[in-house]
Amino acid sequence: MHISILLMEQIIELFIMIFMGFIIVKAGIVKDEDSKVLSKIVLYLIIPCVIINAFQVDYTSKTVRGLLIAFAASVILQLVLLFIISAMGRFFHMNEVEVASVYYSNSGNLIVPIVTFILGQEWVLYGCAFMSVQLVFLWTHCKKIISRESSYDWRKIVLNINMISIVIGVVLFFTRIHLPQLINDTIGSVGSMIGPASMIVTGMLFAGMDLKKVFANRRVYFVTFLRMLLVPLISLILIKISHMAYLSTDAQKIMLIVFLAVITPSASTVTQMCQVYGNDSRYASAINVVTTLCAVVTMPVMVLLYEEFI
């Protein structure tokens, strides 16, 4: 119950940030299209800093074992969910934005502040294991469907700053190299902006929408149901039958972090990619806002279910 209350407080805080982005557009300070610049800053600067900073922890056998559990769980969950959601997409005639919004969680923007707030900074590494796996899917599968490209450009994928940051972070961790304090502090400070910056982008986009149309669109609620209820319940079942929460003394907490990453609202990165690659960013933003609003209730409930059944 304690974790659920802390989680609810953190989600409300992030929702207030969305409201701030909404207000600065409605007040005429900026335009909703100005958010595209901030989206690029999040995608190509802030997220890489988050990843590198997360891997700047002490190398121990316990940490390595926990990291391997987190990576394995993240890969298994995301592959199984990709298969299930792709099948649902065909069955329910979902478009690219809907499929991406159901599949991709907002772990990149929420898991760091949420885990830091409810468990402590030392546990963030395991959340970043999920983020790293999801980033690979984001810059392959998600980029392909959102940009409507017919094939993968592997050179661009490999040379993407997010992919490079994952490699740098992993290499630094396993070689036990710590960056100079000044550089590490700078990277950490930039990375800490991820939650506010992403939420402000969402709020700015939301301000440019016809709110009556947003809330009258039944598809938004259908996508929200899939993202916030069905996907978490499927994930909970997968975690239960895999027995991965019992692989070590810390495994239950590690799997809780992975579960938290899965049950977050639809990814702000989908909105940002829609902006960058010319898809329906306003629809993606509407889904993001509605799922974030629902998360105030659904995420604490899902955590209670996890604590009860895992």
Spans of features found by a protein language model:
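Alpha-helical transmembrane segments of multi-pass small-molecule/ion transporters
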Residues: M1-I310
